[in-house]
Design a protein with these regions (language model features):
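Generic beta-strand structural signal
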Residues: 13, 16-17, 20, 61, 65, 75-77, 93, 125, ...
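Short, solvent-exposed mixed-charge patches
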Residues: 171-172
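Gly/Pro-enriched, hydrophobic low-complexity segments
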Residues: 8, 72-168
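Residues at the C-termini of beta-strands that transition into short coil/loop
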Residues: 26, 67, 152
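Short, conserved active-site entrance elements at the starts or edges of catalytic domains
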Residues: 42-80, 99-105
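An acidic-aromatic
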Residues: 1-46
Length: 172
């Protein structure tokens, strides 16, 4: 759940994914709340599994190396792979650190491939693991930036947090 304390009336935005099904609650959008499907579901799966880099080969196939590039004055190694249902993703790793600094994924839609980009930064050590504390999520018509204040590893999390948002559950 993502709150917006500086925007009264915006309410919280919720994105959840339980490993099979995903949901979106965005209060100021036309749809408001809905179960994600198609390439949007593929994107939710990819976003979740990239939190655990060891799972990259399970979610992306046909991995290939692309020519190096520079992002924000950082030299990057670039890897691209295919996801499910003709989606694909391009991953940008900073050469000097090996850290993922950008992920672009492309999902199919009736009007063609739609890009989504996530930029990762402000990496800090969390129990011996470098974790991004800032990420910017950009898509065709919008952008959200998130700054985390704390990350805790291996703590119990209520399984309901990964399921259908409460407000959707109540509307059944």
């Amino acid at each position: 759940m993502i709150g917006f304390p500086d925007a009264p009336g915006r309410d919280a935005s919720v994105r959840s994914y339980d490993g099979k099904i995903g949901w979106m609650k965005t209060p100021l959008s036309v749809l408001g709340e809905y179960q994600v499907s198609g390439s949007e579901l593929d994107g939710a799966r990819l976003d979740a599994q990239l939190s655990f880099p060891a799972q990259m080969k399970q979610v992306l196939t046909n991995l290939r190396s692309l020519p190096s590039d520079t992002i924000d004055d950082k030299n990057c190694d670039i890897i691209q792979g295919n996801g499910s249902r003709r989606t694909f993703a391009t991953l940008y790793f900073e050469k000097s650190t090996g850290l993922l600094i950008r992920m672009k994924r492309y999902g199919n839609s009736p009007i063609g491939r739609l890009p989504t980009q996530i930029d990762y930064s402000d990496y800090r050590d969390v129990d011996g693991i470098k974790m991004p504390f800032r990420f910017t999520f950009s898509w065709l018509d919008g952008r959200d930036a998130f700054q985390l204040s704390e990350i805790k590893l291996n703590v119990p999390v209520d399984a309901a947090k990964f399921g259908r948002p409460t407000s959707l559950e109540q509307k059944r």
